[in-house]
Amino acid sequence: MRDTILVIEDGSHLYEDTLAALQKFSSFVSKGSYFIVEDGIVTELGMKKKFNGGPQKATREFLKANNNFIIDRKWCDFFGPNATFNVNGYLKRIF
């Protein structure tokens, strides 16, 4: 079994940069480990255009192409429904 790995993406929050980071570093995340995408809240704060769709758009696109990751609602909703700056940003590798 591979080591437990945590990758955190907290870059520019631009859609393109976030998607590139997800694609480049997701292979390092072992089964049962996490890839956290920071600051998806920019969409909720009305800054989606500034960030070309931002982290949430990148996450949605990444998940469509990578069914080995899921959004882990346990962490997204720990304090209430998406009560986090990392909206839909806790990605768990399931296989």
Name each region found by the language model:
Residues 5, 15-95:
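C-terminal substrate-binding/active-site "lid" region of AdoMet-derived donor-dependent transferases
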Residues 10-13:
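Switch II (G3) loop of P-loop NTPases
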